Swiss-Prot record:
GO terms for cellular component: cytosolic large ribosomal subunit. It comes from the Bacteria. NCBIfam families: L12 (TIGR00855). The keyword Ribonucleoprotein applies. GO terms for molecular function: mRNA binding; structural constituent of ribosome. It holds the Pfam family Ribosomal_L12. This is Large ribosomal subunit protein bL12. Keywords: Ribonucleoprotein, Ribosomal protein. Forms part of the ribosomal stalk which helps the ribosome interact with GTP-bound translation factors. Is thus essential for accurate translation. The gene is rplL. Transmembrane segments: none annotated. GO terms for biological process: translation. Homodimer. Part of the ribosomal stalk of the 50S ribosomal subunit. Forms a multimeric L10(L12)X complex, where L10 forms an elongated spine to which 2 to 4 L12 dimers bind in a sequential fashion. Binds GTP-bound translation factors. SUPFAM superfamilies: ClpS-like (SSF54736), Ribosomal protein L7/12, oligomerisation (N-terminal) domain (SSF48300).
């Protein structure tokens, strides 16, 4: 007598969770396999294929309370004159301060200007 897949499925659907767990253990032993969740392996492969961003833009989102300190920080960080720094800071927000920086330089610039009270974002 041959049992088809539908009959097996019907028999399994009538079992309790404990019985199904025991059946899985028996199948693992019989066939020398493991029921490790393969989804975790696939997720890791997808994560590896996603490239990390290599170029960043530094945006000034908010000046904060100490405008003069922000002007000085921007002037120093971007090697601008006083008037250019002031005009840049007083233009409409958000302001792109620098584009195409690597992650290390972008983080450094962000930290330098944020110490003056400004709010910076990396894109």
């Amino acid at each position: 007598m041959s049992i088809n897949k539908q009959q097996i499925l019907d028999a399994v659907s009538e079992m309790s969770v404990l019985e199904i767990s025991e059946l899985v253990s028996m199948m693992e032993k019989k066939f020398g396999v493991s029921s490790i969740n393969n989804n975790n392996i696939n997720v890791n492969k997808v994560d590896e294929s996603v490239e990390e961003k290599s170029e960043f833009d530094v945006l000034l989102l908010e000046i904060g309370k100490n405008k003069i300190s922000v002007i000085k920080s921007v002037r120093s960080a971007l090697s601008l004159g006083l008037k250019e720094s002031k005009d840049l800071i007083e233009s409409e927000l958000p302001i792109t301060l620098k584009t195409g920086l690597n992650k290390k330089d972008a983080e450094s610039l962000k930290k330098e200007i944020e110490t003056s009270g400004a709010r910076i974002e990396l894109k």
